[in-house]
Amino acid sequence: MRTFEYRVYPNRAQRQQLMACLSESRSIYNEMLAALQAQYEADGTFPSKYDLNMRFKGRGGEHVPATTVQMLSDRLSKALKRALQLKDLGLPVGFPRFKAANRWHSIQLRQYAPSRDVWMDADRKHLHVPAKLGRLLKIKLHRPLVGTPVTAHLVLRADNHWYALIVCETLPQDEQGIVHAEQVACDHPPIGLDVGLKVFLADSEGDTVENPRHYRRGQKRLAHAQRTLCRRKKGSHRRRKVAREVACKHLKIARQRRHHHFTVAKHYAERYSRICVEDLNVVGMARNHHLAKSIHDASWSAFLVILTDKAERAGHGVIRVPARFTTQKCRRCGEHVQKSLSVRTHLCPHCGLVEDRDVHAAKNILQTGLTEVQAGAPPSGTGQDAAPEELRSPRL
C-alpha cells in the first residue's frame, strides 16, 4: 500500500462544507466513544463495529456522508484494538480519548471508484467527492498515481490548506518490473550505514551526510512564537492566530526533515544492492535526557522505514544487524576498544588501526551484515507504507 498526497483547492462554499463535515464528524466520533464507554461500564463488554454502525445509522445528517460515519466506527474500533494490544504487552496505555477541535483534522472517504465516494475526473484536474463535501474539488496532481486507488482522506494541515491523501494498492514487485536483490547483487555493491548525531550518517566507503538539525535551527524562532502564544488570552482571536503560526513552524520543520530523509534514502537505495544498518532501540536511547532532543530531531526510525521501502522498490534489501559493539569492536583484529561519545577517532592499541569512529562503525556493520547474509538471514523490510499521520496543533 502506498499513500499519495495532493493539494486540493476548494472554493469558499466548499471550504465551509468541509469544515462543517469536519466538526460534525468529530462530534459523532465523541458520541461513539461515549456509547462505548457506557457499555463497558455497564456490562464490561465493548460494542462491535457493526453495532456502532447500526446505532449511528443516519446520524450524518446534511453535513457528513453515510460512508464517513461508517469509517468513524472503524477508526474507533482500530484505536481500541490497538490500545488493548499494547495493554496486553504491559505497556502504559490509556483509553481512546475524546477529540478536541485541534486534534481532529481528517475526513475519511471509504470507496475510491467511479460513482462511489471519491474518484478522479477525466481531466485529471478535479476530484469527485460526495455532494455534502462540495461534489467537485480542484486538485493538482504533481505526480502520477501508482497502483489501484482504494480509499482517500481529506486532511486539513496546520497551514490551513486541504490535501487529498489517496491510498493505493500496489502490484507485486515482480509485476512492476522490479527484480529481486539476488539478481542485481552483481551490479550494485553492498554498503554499511551508521546513523549518528554529529553527522546524520556515515557509510563504509568513508562518505558522511551532514546532520541538518532542522528543529534546533528553527528553535529560536519557534520559542519566540511560543512565548507570544503563552501571553495571549485563551479563546481569543489573537491566540488562535499565534497558535496557527506555531503550528505552521512545526509543520515546516517536519516537512524539511522528511524531505531530507527521502533524499538520502533515495541516494543509497538506488546505488547499493544490500544496505546494512543497525537495529537500534531508539526508544531506549531517547531516555538519555542529554541526547533525547537531538535523537528525535534526527528521527532515525522514520529514515530507516523510508530507506527500507525505497530499497524494496529498487529491488534491493536492507539488513538490520545487532547494534552491540559495532563502535567498540576493532574491525581488523576483533579486540574491544572502549571509547566514550566524546572520542571521535578509533585508535586500536592492539593492531594500530586509526580511523574515523563513525566510518569504522559502518564498516563493522557491513561485515556483520554480509556474514548474516551468508548464514542465510533474509533482508528485513516493511512492504507497506504507514497510514497517514495527522500533525497536531497547539491547543487554542
Language-model features and meaning:
Residues M1-L396:
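Nucleic-acid substrate recognition interfaces
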